[in-house]
C-alpha cells in the first residue's frame, strides 16, 4: 500500500463518556477564542473585489453517503452474541484451522448500493473442534452456513453468531469435527450481503462523469483488515489460500480480479457471470475485484506478460506515462530479483475516489487517480515523479509482500519498508537523470529522523493486538525508517551482496510467509556478515543515535531525542538504546568504514589516513547511515567557513545532511542555534535542490514558531529573502530546465513567496490575475505556486468562486488537488469557513480529499485555528463518516503540531479527554501532544539566542 497520501474502516459509532462540564466549557471557550482570533483578521482580507456568490456545486449522486439501512436479509441468522466460552475471544485465529481454497462469488446491485455473495471455503483442520470462526464485519450472513466433511457428508450446524468484539462469525456444529486426514478438507459455505456505499474500504461504489453522464464503478480495498468487510474470511496474512472468484455483473460492464478471465457466461438479458482463473496462494488483504466501464492502455513486458492500465475513457491519454514506467520498472525488478512475476497478467486501475495512495493487490493494483494518471500538458514534474514512485512502489510489492508476505503485521516493514526503498531504485533505473538515490534523503531519511526522535515513536517491529493498532503502524516508521535502514544496510554489506540476499530470501519463501529474522538469515548467508546482530538494534528499539565527535577522531554514541528533558532510557529497551553502527567517513577524498559495536561503551577512535592526523573527517557521507553527527563547535565553524569559501567542497547530499543535522541538534539543545544559522550564510551561492529542500524544512519550523512574533518574524523574513533571491532570480518565473531544475524552481520560488518577497508575490499575483482573466495558460510547474500565493496575496470572493468553478470543471485529479490548495490559501475567514462547510458536500469534495483540504487550510495563518476548531466541533461527524479505524482521521490531529502556547495545549488535552477513544489515532495524539510541549519549551529556550543572531546580523549590515 502506498501511504504517502497518508490513509480500513469500521462503520460503527463509538459511544464516548463526556468529561465534566468544566472541560466542555474550556473547549468551548477555546473555540470561541480561536474563531475570534481569526475573525479579527477578516476586515482586510476580502481584497478589492466586489461581492460574489459561490457557484452551486454540481449535484451528482453521492457514492459514499452513509447507508440508510442494511440490505434486505434476515438479521437474526447469525445474531450478535457476547458468548466468550471459546477461543474466539482471542484476537488471533487458531493455528489448527487453515483455509486452503476459497470459491467466492459476488453480485453487485449498483442501483441499490448493495451486493450479495456466496463463499465456499475448503478448510484443513489439524485438531478436533465443534467450532469454526472466521472474520466478518458489517456484512451479514443471510442463510445458515452449510458444513461438509471431507467425505462430502453434511454436518448439521447448530447455530452461528457474531462475536463483534473480535470481528468474528462463529459457526457451531452439532458434533465434533475430527482432524482432516490426507487431502481431505472440510467445506464451509456461507451466503452474505453487504453495502456498497458509506465507505472507501471493503467492496464499495464510487462515481465519475463521462460526457456529462454520471457512471459507477465498484471496487475493493482490503488492507489491512477490510477483506472481512467484503466477505467472510480468515483475515490474517499468514492464512494464505488459493481463490476462484466469479462476479455476476450488468452486461454493459466488465469485470476484473487478481487472475485472468477463465470464462464469461450470459445469465440472462441483463447479467453476465465472469469467472476468473484459480489464483496462486495469497493473503486475504490482496484479494481484489472490480466492475467497470473503463478503457485500457497496454504494454507487454520483456518476459511476455501483459501490463494493462484501466482508466476512464476520457482520460485514456493520461495513462500513457504510467504504462511506460510500468514496463521499464517491471522489467528491471524481474531482472534484479532474478524471479519472474508469478501471475499471467498485471492490471492497474485508477479509482475515482480511493482512500489510500494505491494498493498492491496481486495482479490488479488499485490507485488513487493522482498517483497513476499524468498529463504532460497539464501536470507538474512533481506529479510525474509521484506517479513514477507510486507505480514502482506497488510493483515492488508484487515480490516483497505478495510472493513473500510478512507472517504478521508486526513485521509490516518487510512489505512497506522494502517497497519504499526499492521504489527509488526502480525509478532511478527508468528516469536516470532524476537523482532518485539522492532524493531518498529528502523523501524518507531526513523527514523520518524527526519523527523517530520523539518519545512517542515506536520500533520498526512492534506488537499489534487490535485492528486499530494494525492500521496505525502504516506510518513513517514502517515505510520511511524501514527504507532508510535498508539504504544503510545495502551500503554496509555492499549492493551485490544485498541483491543476492534478496534473491535468496524470495526464492526460499515464495508463496509463503516470513519474519524479519528470515530476511537477516538470507543476508548473512549472502554477505558473511553479522547482519542480525547489527540490524536488531535498528528494528527492535525505537530511535537512533547521535555520534558525538571529540577532537577529530574520537566518537561516542547517545540516543538522539528532540526533547532534552526526556529520559533517554525510556520506554525500557533490552538493547539499552545503543546501536551497532556501520560508521563511514571520508578524509581527503578517501572513504573508510568501521563497525561501531554497542559494547564499546567508551566509544571508538577512527583511523586517519592523513599523516598529520588533523585532517577533517566527514562522518556519514551523503547521510548514508541512519544517525546524526555532532562535531565540536570549532569544527562546525570550520564547516561554515568552508561552505562560504567553496560549498562544492561537500557533495549536495552532504550539504543537505550538514544543514539538517545542525538544525536538529540545535532544536535538541545539543548545539547553539547561532552555529546552525551560520551554516546558512553561504546560501546565496547554493543552486542545488537537496540543500535547499532541507533549509526550507528547517526554516519552516522556526518561522512556524515565530509567526506571531512581530519583532523577530520580520527579521527572519528579511534575511531569508536575501538568501533565496539569487537562485530565485536566476531560475525565474518560467518552466525551463530539466526535471530536477523544475523541482528546485518550485521550491525556491515558493520559499521566496513564503518569506514575503514582494517581487515573487507580485509575480504570483500577476499570473493569477491573467489566469482569472483567461489571458494565459499557466506553466504546469508554476500552477500550484500561482494558485496558492496569487490567492493569498490578492484573492477575494470573486477569484475564490472562479477557482472553485475551475475545480468543478477539470477532470484531471492532479489539477483538482492544486486548485483545492489554492482555495485553502485565501486570507478571508468567511471564505475559509464556507470552504470548511463544503467538506460535508460529498458531491463536491471527494471523501478521499476531505483531510487533504483540512490540512491545506491549516497551513494558512488565517485558517490554522479555524481548521483545528472545525475538527473539534465536527468530531462526531468525522467519526461517523470515516470511523476511528481510519488512519487519515487518526492523523488529522497532527495539524496542531505548530501550536506553541499553554492555552492551545490545554485545549488539545481537553479535546482528547472529551473523546478518549482514539482508534488508529492513538500514536498521532501522543506525537502531537509531545510536539506541542516541546514547542512551548523550545520558545523559552531559544528565542533570545535566535533573536540575537538575526539582530547582530542586521546590525552589521
Swiss-Prot record:
One of its GO terms (biological process) is regulation of blood pressure. Pfam families: ERAP1_C, Peptidase_M1, Peptidase_M1_N. The chain crosses the membrane at residues 19-39. Its EC number is 3.4.11.7. The active site is at residue 394. It catalyses: Release of N-terminal glutamate (and to a lesser extent aspartate) from a peptide. Gene3D superfamilies: 1.25.50.20, 2.60.40.1910, Neutral Protease Domain 2, tricorn interacting facor f3 domain. GO terms for cellular component: apical part of cell; apical plasma membrane; brush border; cytoplasm; cytoplasmic vesicle; external side of plasma membrane; extracellular exosome; extracellular space. Its main location: membrane. It is a single-pass type II membrane protein. It is found in: Cell membrane. Regulates central hypertension through its calcium-modulated preference to cleave N-terminal acidic residues from peptides such as angiotensin II. Homodimer; disulfide-linked. PANTHER family: GLUTAMYL AMINOPEPTIDASE, PROTEASE M1 ZINC METALLOPROTEASE. This is Glutamyl aminopeptidase. The gene is ENPEP.
Amino acid at each position: 500500500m502506498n501511504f504517502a497520501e497518508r490513509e480500513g474502516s469500521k462503520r460503527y459509532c463509538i459511544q464516548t463518556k463526556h468529561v465534566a462540564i468544566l472541560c466542555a466549557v474550556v473547549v468551548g471557550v477555546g473555540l470561541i477564542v480561536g474563531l475570534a482570533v481569526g475573525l479579527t483578521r477578516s476586515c482586510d482580507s476580502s481584497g478589492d473585489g466586489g461581492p460574489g456568490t459561490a457557484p452551486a456545486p454540481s449535484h451528482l449522486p453521492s457514492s459514499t453517503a452513509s447507508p440508510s439501512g442494511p440490505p434486505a436479509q434476515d438479521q437474526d441468522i447469525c445474531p450478535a452474541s457476547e458468548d466468550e466460552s471459546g477461543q474466539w475471544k482471542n484476537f488471533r485465529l487458531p493455528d489448527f484451522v487453515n483455509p486452503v481454497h476459497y470459491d467466492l462469488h459476488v453480485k453487485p446491485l449498483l442501483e441499490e448500493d448493495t451486493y450479495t455473495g456466496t463463499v465456499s471455503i475448503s478448510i484443513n483442520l489439524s485438531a478436533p473442534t465443534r467450532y469454526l470462526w472466521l472474520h466478518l464485519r458489517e456484512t451479514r450472513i443471510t442463510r445458515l452456513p452449510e458444513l461438509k466433511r471431507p467425505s462430502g457428508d453434511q454436518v448439521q450446524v447448530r447455530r452461528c453468531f457474531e462475536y463483534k468484539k473480535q470481528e468474528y462469525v462463529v459457526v457451531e456444529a452439532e458434533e465434533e469435527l475430527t482432524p482432516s486426514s490426507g487431502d481431505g478438507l472440510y467445506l464451509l459455505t456461507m451466503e452474505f450481503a453487504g453495502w456498497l456505499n458509506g465507505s472507501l474500504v471493503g467492496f464499495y461504489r464510487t462515481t465519475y462523469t463521462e460526457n456529462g453522464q454520471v457512471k459507477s464503478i465498484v471496487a475493493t480495498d482490503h488492507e489491512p483488515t477490510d477483506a472481512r468487510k467484503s466477505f467472510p474470511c480468515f483475515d490474517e496474512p499468514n492464512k494464505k489460500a488459493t481463490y476462484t472468484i466469479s462476479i455476476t455483473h450488468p452486461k454493459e460492464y466488465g469485470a476484473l480480479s487478481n487472475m485472468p478471465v477463465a470464462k464469461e457466461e450470459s445469465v440472462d438479458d441483463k447479467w453476465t457471470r465472469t469467472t476468473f482463473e484459480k489464483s496462486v496462494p495469497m493473503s486475504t488483504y490482496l484479494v481484489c475485484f472490480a466492475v467497470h466501464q473503463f478503457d485500457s492502455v497496454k504494454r507487454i513486458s520483456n518476459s511476455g506478460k501483459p501490463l494493462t492500465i484501466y482508466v476512464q475513457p476520457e482520460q485514456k491519454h493520461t495513462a500513457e506515462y504510467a504504462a511506460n514506467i510500468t514496463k521499464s520498472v517491471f522489467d528491471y525488478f524481474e531482472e534484479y530479483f532474478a524471479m519472474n512475476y508469478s501471475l499471467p497478467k498485471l492490471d492497474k486501475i485508477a479509482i475515482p475516489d480511493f482512500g489510500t495512495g494505491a494498493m498492491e493487490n496481486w495482479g490488479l493494483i488499485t490507485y488513487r487517480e493522482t498517483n497513476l494518471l499524468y498529463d504532460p500538458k497539464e501536470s507538474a514534474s512533481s506529479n510525474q515523479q509521484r506517479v513514477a514512485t507510486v507505480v514502482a512502489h506497488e510493483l515492488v510489492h508484487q515480490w516483497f509482500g505478495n510472493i513473500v508476505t510478512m507472517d504478521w503485521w508486526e513485521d509490516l516493514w518487510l512489505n512497506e519498508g522494502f517497497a519504499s526503498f526499492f521504489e527509488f531504485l526502480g525509478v532511478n533505473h527508468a528516469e536516470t537523470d532524476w537523482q532518485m538515490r539522492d532524493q531518498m534523503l529528502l523523501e524518507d531519511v531526513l523527514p523520518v529522523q524527526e519523527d523517530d526522535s520523539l518519545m512517542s515513536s515506536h520500533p520498526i517491529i512492534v506488537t499489534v493486538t487490535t485492528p486499530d493498532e494494525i492500521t496505525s503502524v502504516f506510518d513513517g516508521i514502517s515505510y520511511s525508517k524501514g527504507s532508510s535502514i535498508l539504504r544503510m544496510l545495502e551500503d554496509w554489506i555492499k549492493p551485490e551482496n544485498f541483491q543476492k540476499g534478496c534473491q535468496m530470501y524470495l526464492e526460499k519463501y515464495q508463496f509463503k510467509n516470513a519474519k524479519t529474522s528470515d530476511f537477516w538469515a538470507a543476508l548473512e548467508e549472502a554477505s558473511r556478515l553479522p547482519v542480525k546482530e547489527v540490524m536488531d538494534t535498528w528494528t527492535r528499539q525505537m530511535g537512533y543515535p547521535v555520534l558525538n565527535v571529540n577532537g577529530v577522531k574520537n566518537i561516542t554514541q547517545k540516543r538522539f531525542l528532540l526533547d532534552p528533558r526526556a529520559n533517554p532510557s525510556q520506554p525500557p529497551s533490552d538493547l539499552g538504546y545503543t546501536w551497532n553502527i556501520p560508521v563511514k567517513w571520508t578524509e581527503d577524498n578517501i572513504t573508510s568504514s568501521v563497525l561501531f559495536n554497542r559494547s564499546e561503551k567508551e566509544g571508538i577512535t577512527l583511523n586517519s589516513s592523513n599523516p598529520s592526523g588533523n585532517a577533517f573527517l566527514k562522518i556519514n557521507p551523503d547521510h548514508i547511515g541512519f544517525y546524526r553527527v555532532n562535531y565540536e563547535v570549532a569544527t562546525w565553524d570550520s564547516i561554515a567557513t568552508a561552505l562560504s569559501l567553496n560549498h562544492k567542497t561537500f557533495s549536495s547530499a552532504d550539504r543537505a545532511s550538514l544543514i539538517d543535522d545542525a538544525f536538529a541538534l540545535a532544536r535538541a539543545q545539543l548545539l547553539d542555534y547561532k552555529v546552525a544559522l551560520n551554516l546558512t550564510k553561504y546560501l546565496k551561492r547554493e543552486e542545488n535542490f537537496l540543500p535547499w529542500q532541507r533549509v526550507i524544512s528547517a526554516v519552516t519550523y522556526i518561522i512556524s514558531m515565530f509567526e506571531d512574533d512581530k519583532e523577530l518574524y520580520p527579521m527572519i523574513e528579511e534575511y531569508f529573502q536575501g538568501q533565496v533571491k539569487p537562485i530565485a532570480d536566476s531560475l525565474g518565473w518560467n518552466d525551463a530546465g530539466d526535471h530536477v531544475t523544475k523541482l528546485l524552481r518550485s521550491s525556491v520560488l515558493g520559499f521566496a513567496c513564503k518569506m514575503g518577497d514582494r517581487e515573487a508575490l507580485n509575480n504570483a499575483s500577476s499570473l493569477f490575475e491573467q489566469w482569472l482573466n483567461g489571458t494565459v495558460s499557466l506553466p504546469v510547474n508554476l500552477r500550484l505556486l500561482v494558485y496558492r500565493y496569487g490567492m493569498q496575496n490578492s484573492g477575494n470572493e470573486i477569484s475564490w468562486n472562479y477557482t472553485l468553478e475551475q475545480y468543478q470543471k477539470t477532470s484531471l485529479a492532479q489539477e483538482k488537488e492544486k486548485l483545492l490548495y489554492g482555495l485553502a490559501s485565501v486570507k478571508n475567514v468567511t471564505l475559509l469557513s464556507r470552504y470548511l462547510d463544503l467538506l460535508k458536500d460529498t458531491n463536491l469534495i471527494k471523501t478521499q480529499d476531505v483531510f487533504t483540504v483540512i490540512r491545506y487550510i491549516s497551513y494558512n495563518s488565517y485558517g490554522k485555528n479555524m481548521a483545528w476548531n472545525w475538527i473539534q466541533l465536527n468530531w462526531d461527524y468525522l467519526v461517523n463518516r470515516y470511523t476511528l479505524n481510519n488512519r487519515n482521521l487518526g492523523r488529522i490531529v497532527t495539524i496542531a503540531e505548530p501550536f506553541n502556547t499553554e492555552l492551545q495545549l490545554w485545549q488539545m488535552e481537553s479535546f482528547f479527554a472529551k473523546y478518549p477513544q482514539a482508534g488508529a489515532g492513538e500514536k498521532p495524539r501522543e506525537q502531537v501532544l509531545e510536539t506541542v510541549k516541546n514547542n512551548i519549551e523550545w520558545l523559552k529556550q531559544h528565542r533570545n539566542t535566535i533573536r540575537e543572531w538575526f539582530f547582530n546580523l542586521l546590525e552589521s549590515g
